[in-house]
Structure formats: C-alpha cells, structure tokens
Amino acid sequence: MEREYMEFDVVIVGAGPAGLSAACRLKQKAAEAGQEISVCVVEKGSEVGAHILSGAVFEPRALNELFPDWKELGAPLNTPVTGDDIYVLKSAESATKVPNFFVPKTMHNEGNYIISLGNLCRWLAQQAEGLGVEIYPGFAAQEALIDENGVVRGIVTGDLGVDREGNPKEGYYTPGMELRAKYTLFAEGCRGHIGKQLIKKYNLDSEADAQHYGIGIKEIWDIDPSKHKPGLVVHTAGWPLNDENTGGSFLYHLENNQVFVGLIIDLSYSNPHLSPFDEFQRYKHHPVVKQYLEGGKRVAYGARAICKGGLNSLPKMVFPGGALIGCDLGTLNFAKIKGSHTAMKSGMLAADAIAEALAAGRVGGDELSNYVDAFKASWLYDELFRSRNFGAAIHKFGAIGGGAFNFIDQNIFGGKIPVTLHDDKPDYACLKKASEAPKIDYPKPDGKLSFDKLSSVFLSNTNHEEDQPIHLKLADASIPIEKNLPLYDEPAQRYCPAGVYEVVANDDGSKRFQINAQNCVHCKTCDIKDPAQNITWVAPEGTGGPNYPNM
C-alpha cells in the first residue's frame, strides 16, 4: 500500500539512553561543522521515560563526554553513592556480609549516582529538543523499511485503529507512516523486535555466542525516614536462588525517603516451576531487605529483560543503511551490572560515524564501518573486553565458583585473564523437564511486603487498547497445551511477571492457553524464554504498555 512519508537524515527508534545520546551527539556535531542534520526519534511509550526501567546506579562517564556541564544544566543525578554493602544470603534468615577486599573491583560504586533512568531520559529528551531533534512519543516502529537491494531506508510506524481481527475500525483507522532516512539507528532496548528481525535477516550473529538475558523485577518503596540511608547501595547473591537458577538482587537508597528494590534472575534458569515474580516477592522477607521495607509503602512496580551476554554475544553492529546501538546491540557491562553509560557511548559512537559520513557527502544506505572501527578503539570496547568472562563464569561454575573466578579475573588480572570463557547454549534451551525438577511451594503474599501479580501490574500503570490485534504472536497455537504443558508445565504462566499467560480449564475439562495481552509490561521475557521459541513479541499500538513515572 502507498503510505504517507516524511524524510530525515537520521531516524532513531527508541528514546532511551542510547537513542537520545545519539540524537544529541548528531546535533552537536552538525552545529560544530556548520551543517544541517535532520534527526527524528520515535518512541512507542506514551511519553519519553514511560517504558524505561533500570536499577539504576549510574556511571556518569558517557554523560561527562556528552554534556560536560550536566550539573549546571540540571541533570537529575541527585544522590551520589555513599557506600556499598554486599551480602551472600545463605537461607531465608541468614546472611554473610562480604568483606570489601573480596568484592570484585567492578562492584565498587564510588563516583556513581543512584538515579531514575526514566527521569534522566526525560532530561536528555529536553536537551535533544533544545538542539533541534524531533521526538515523537506514542508512535511504535513496526518494521524496518527495506528496499529491493536489501538496504534499510527507515522504518514504518504501526497502524492505529485496527480491531482484534486485523480490520480497520471505522472512524478510527490511521495507517502507519514511512519515516525515511539516509541512516537508521535501532535503540529499542533489550530484545528489540525490529533488532531481532534485522539480526536474522542480515545474519548478524553468525560469529557471536548466543545472547544471554536476565529478567529484572523492580519496585519503588517509600520507607520510614529513620531507616533511610541516602546513597547506600546493597547487592545480594544466593537465596532465594541457587547454582542452577542464578541471579542477584539490589536495594538502592535514593532521595526523598525512597528505595529501589529488585531481583535479577538469569533466564538460563533450569527449573520450569520457578516463578521470577514469586522469587522476588519472597526475597523481600529476608531480614537484610525487610529491615528497610518494613512499615513502608510500595508505590511502583515493573519488569524488563536485560541483555547480559556481553562482548562474546555481540552481533555484527552494522548493515546497509543502519546500525544497532545500546541494549538492542547488547552493550551492557554485566560485571558492573550497568548498561546505561555503555548504551549512551554506543549511541554517541554511531552518531559520530553518521556525522562523518554525511559531512563527507555520502548519501546513506551504506555500511557504517567507521562506527565499528571507533567502537573497537573506544573505552566501551575495553570495558566489555574486561568483563567478557563474568556471566559465562557464573553459568559454568555457579555463584560461588564463578564469583571466585571473577574475583581473580577482575581484581588480580584487571579483566585480562588470558582465557575467554564461552557459553553458547541459549537460555530457552536450559529448562529441565517438569518431571525432573523440584516443585517450588511459594508462600502466599502478606499484602505488606509481598503482593500478587494483579495488584503489582496495577502499579505499573499498564494500559493497552483492548480491541487491537494481540501483540504476542504464537507461531503454532497448539504448542502451549500439547507440548509445553506436558513437558514443562507450561512455564509461561510463571516466567511472565505480569500474568499475561494462563492455562485455564474449559467447561468440558480440557485446557486452553489464554493470553491477557492488556497486562503486558513489555519485558520481552516470553520472546526469550519460551522453550519452543513459539512466542514473538511485536509492538502493539503506540502509547500502549506501562507508564512508569520514575523507574
């Protein structure tokens, strides 16, 4: 069909730290060179920041480069880290505090800040618009615009006003637009659905290890002022997880008597009975955590997958007409459990490459090889190289053995131990059969520290237009009941942190698989963990999904 179109020099998909940093850098470079570069950013959330969720302890290295005067400009970095506490939780009641000497250097946070990444992205968007960037929130990029020569020429935004059966709704239908560009940057975050398509189409991961993921579940709490320690960073390993189902937790004291509390579970976990949501709820009852939360009030909830494969799992970064940046590429430094500064730097490097190409009179559609060269010469590459073994060591040797390896690698060899560990088994292939794994009996939530999924999703402010095509696509509708249920007790009912997937009984006693798509918080776990790789997440109508205030 013929669609309306707009033309830009650069289109960026996603208003997260990578996309917004790229946009700002492009405009800065254009101003320095006295040239015009038109830049458009599309964002599927209802506003910038609505879909942003991160810990976040923020390292300002890339921000210092992008806006050296960020303090004067009012960037929302208000809580410097004042201390790091690391515990190994041995059971539901006991814990050992790790002496500072034994903590990997990458886990020290002097000079970093506890922030809301959503609020930082809102601030970056203000800077970008001040520089002349056009930002369009509420518009979901649905697919890449690829010409007959296999060159990416921009994106197509999703149609609006389509009913559940795919038919236009009278009086409401608006076809999506083509946003054409000389170069297109994809900054959709972890497991971006267009990024996934591009990796497959251009075979970008042919020389990379399998990507690895975690699911991060996070809440914001208002706590008793007498328990509040602004700037304190608490990390834990161990209980409620184990060596076959690994992960770790965080609890960060920010300003205004608030804490961020969360649990990250590696999606390589093996027990199909495991529920990341319920593990997080019971984790909050541990004395190390409860001491801060007791008497407080939960005010926000959300979840998001993270890419943690690191350097060994990076796909090729470029293709004709564009590039992957940030978590769409997989630049998170898992040794630091930080991805914001690395995402920003990748966006800035790509922006430099595009500005250079346009200044040289290139008309677009080519491969940005100068982005790849600049990446390999940057501190970003050095960081990812030094942390390349961190996740693989934990997968191979467990939390204790992997922790010992990482201590030696990071503290003695500075991340340059002369061996590279590879972990090429994809996360979805790690599940045991339900009959081979112990069942897990989760305690009922008490409504004070622990809660159920529905009341949690309510706090994410998630909303979707109900009469639209379901954005969680099953390649084969029979697999959930006929294969996943008998083999794995259909793990989707547990790995989803928002109650999207249910196995329900029909009147005749048979079972059916129900998808409550309106609950989806866009975490992407189902797209990653389904053992049959039968679920594909695509973007729903723009503005749909969570509306995180300051996650």
Model-assigned labels for residue ranges:
Residues G330-K336, M348, D352-F397, Q514-N516, ...:
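Active-site-proximal substrate-binding core of FAD-dependent oxidoreductases
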Residues A18, E47, R191:
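Conserved Rossmann-like nucleotide-cofactor binding loop
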Residues P486-Q518, K524-N547:
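Iron-sulfur cluster-binding cysteine motifs and their immediate structural context
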Residues E36, K44-E93:
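N-terminal FAD cofactor-binding segment of flavoenzymes
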Residues A303-F334, S456-D467, P480-Y495, E502:
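FAD-binding beta-loop-beta segment adjacent to the flavin cofactor pocket
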Residues I394-K448:
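C-terminal auxiliary extensions adjacent to catalytic cores
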Residues V10-C40:
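N-terminal Rossmann-like FAD-binding beta1-loop-alpha1 element of flavoenzymes
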Residues G118, R122, Q127-Q291, L349, ...:
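Predominantly flavin-linked oxidoreductase catalytic cores and closely associated redox partners
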